[in-house]
């Protein structure tokens, strides 16, 4: 039997990957507006545990951000 004052533990709902599904956006190094959502205010790539991006798509995203930086579409550091 459960105690009268015992609470149920809080379970955070697992977020779904924003790049999976039928009408999900395609990760492209030329789409700097989309890529900027996954870069912090200091210019670092935001980890997947915060953005809920799957491991496969996180690797794709990191590759696209790095390509975009190399071509000068995204800054390396934001001041």
Swiss-Prot record:
Would you kindly state one Gene Ontology biological process term found in this protein's UniProt entry? translation
Q: Name one GO molecular function term.
A: structural constituent of ribosome
Enumerate the InterPro entries for this protein: Ribosomal_bS18 (IPR001648), Ribosomal_bS18_CS (IPR018275), Ribosomal_bS18_sf (IPR036870)
Query: Cellular component GO terms, alphabetically?
Result: cytosolic small ribosomal subunit
Sorted alphabetically, which keywords does the UniProt record give?
Ribonucleoprotein, Ribosomal protein, RNA-binding, rRNA-binding
One Pfam family this sequence matches: Ribosomal_S18
Which HAMAP family does the record associate with it? Ribosomal_bS18
Biological role stated in the UniProt entry: Binds as a heterodimer with protein bS6 to the central domain of the 16S rRNA, where it helps stabilize the platform of the 30S subunit.
The Swiss-Prot or TrEMBL record describes its family as follows: Belongs to the bacterial ribosomal protein bS18 family.
Please give the subunit comment from the record.
Part of the 30S ribosomal subunit. Forms a tight heterodimer with protein bS6.
- Annotated protein name in UniProt: Small ribosomal subunit protein bS18
Q: From which organism does this entry originate?
A: Rhodopseudomonas palustris (strain BisB18)
Name the gene: rpsR
């Amino acid at each position: 039997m459960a105690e009268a004052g015992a609470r149920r533990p809080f379970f955070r709902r697992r977020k779904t990957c924003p790049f999976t599904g039928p009408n999900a956006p395609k990760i492209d190094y030329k789409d700097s507006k989309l890529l900027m959502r996954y870069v912090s205010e200091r210019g670092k790539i935001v980890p997947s545990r915060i953005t809920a991006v799957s491991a496969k798509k996180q690797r794709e995203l990191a590759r696209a951000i790095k390509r975009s930086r190399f071509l000068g579409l995204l800054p390396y550091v934001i001041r």
